[in-house]
Amino acid sequence: MTAANARLLTTLLSLAEDTGSLSDELHFAGRDATERDPLDHGAANVLRALVLPKAPRVLEVGAGFGGLTRYLGEVAATVHAVEADPVRAAAVRFRTRGLGTVTVHDKLVVETYDLVVVQQPYATRNLLDWVRERLSPTGAVVVLTASRGVAGTLAAAGLEVQRELLCSPGHEVARAVRGARIDTELPRLSAAIAGGPANGLALLCGPGAAALWPPYRLATYFNTAERAAFACTRADVVRTGEGAEVRRVPLVPSPPVAGISVGPCADKVYDAPTMVEVLLDEPERVAELLTGWRDLVREEAARGVEALWDLVPHNVLVDGATLRPIDLEWRNAGAGVSEVVERGVLVLADKLADAGWPAAADGGSMRDLAGWLGVLIGLHPSFVDGALEREVAFSTIGSCGTEHGTDEVRGSIAEIWRKRLARTVHEYRSTKAGAGVAANEDEVAKR
C-alpha cells in the first residue's frame, strides 16, 4: 500500500461517524480493493469465526488500520494493539475511538495475555519467544499468514500449530474459514462455500488453541460482502449425530427494514446438487423441476414458513425425487406465494442465462427465457416487469439497510437488471460462475 493510500484511509477513519466493526459507512467508502479491504464488514471475519475466550486480555501485533482491533475491542476486556507505523497507529486510534477497552502502542507491553493475534510479517523467533513467555496457562496464539512457512518458526519457539484453518479468499477479508476435514467429509459443500482457492491461513497455537475451534465444527462462512450490516449473517457447518448441519444466524439482531429482514435457519447437509445445477446438466427436466418447485413453495407457505422469500431454485437441492429447501434466511413481509414464484423464475432465468443455458431459444434474450420458464408453470410472460420491480426494491434495501435516500442505488440496480434482461443468452457466458448477478443478495449494488 502506498503512503498516499495509507493517509487517505486514516483520513476516512478520522471523519467517519460510525467506526464499528460492521460499519456500513466504512464498508461502502472504499474505491478499490486496497481501500476496501481494511474497511470491509468482513475484515474481522477470521476472528469472528473463532470461539474467543470470555472477556480476554488480548495482544494484537501488527494492527494495520484497525479492522481486527475494532472487533477485538467490542468483545474483549482489554486489547493492547501494537502498530509501529505512526500513520497506521493513528488510523487504529480513529477506528477504535469510544472503546475504553483498546489502547494503541508502538512497542510491546509486558502483561499476561489470554489471546495473542500476530500478522505474519511480525512472527519472528524473538517475538514468538516473548509471546510464549507471556501467555496465560490457557492462552492461545493466532498467526494470520499466507504461507505455512511460519509453522517452523512457531515450533522452534515452542508454539506448535495445533490447528490450521483455511481462509478464502484470504485472511484479510475471509468469506469462509474451514478446517481441512470438510474437504474430504463434505467435498461438495466445501467447494461451494470456499468459492475458490484459500489464499490465507489462521494458525492456532498454544495451550488454549483447541478451544478456539471446537472439534464438531467443520467450517464457518459469512455473507458480509454486498449487504448492509442489518443483513449480514454467519453460517457454521457442524457435525451432528445424524451427519452435519448448517446453522445460520444474523451477525447483529436488527429490526426489519421496509418488511425486509434476515433470520436464523438450520439445514441438514445433503450431498445433492441444486436445482440450477441439475438444469444445467439435464435441461430436459425443466418442466418437471419447475412444477415441483412451485408446489414446494405452496406447501411451505401452507406450513407457515417465515422465510418464503428465499425459497428460489438456487436454494433447492434435488435429492433424488425429493426437493429440499436450504439457506432460507431472507424474510419479506410483503411477499406471498405468487411473488416468490415470480421471483424464483426471474432469478433462475438470470442464472441460466449467466451459464449460456443450451436449452434457451436461439437468439432469445434473458427476458424471453424468463417469460418461457414462467409459461411452463402458468405465468403470463408479462410477470417479468412486476418481478423485476420487486427485486430491485429488495436488492436496494438489502444493500443500503434503509428505504430512504436510495434513489441513486435503486437506479443503478434497475439499470443492471435492464441490461441483463436484454442480453442474448447464447452470446453471453460469464467467465466466473454467478459473476455480476445483481439478483444474488450477496452481490447487490456493486458501486
Predicted regions mapped to residue ranges:
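Conserved SAM-binding loop of SAM-dependent methyltransferases across substrates and taxa
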Residues: 65-76
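Catalytic activation segment of kinase domains across protein kinase-like and atypical kinase folds
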Residues: 303-358
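Conserved class I S-adenosyl-L-methionine
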Residues: 55-64
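A short glycine-rich, Lys/Arg-flanked "PGG" loop and its adjoining helix->strand segment in the class I
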Residues: 126-137
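N-terminal auxiliary segments of SAM/dcSAM-dependent transferases
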Residues: 1-19
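Conserved alpha-helix/loop element of class I SAM-dependent methyltransferases that forms part
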Residues: 37-56
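Rossmann-like AdoMet/SAM-dependent catalytic core
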Residues: 167-243
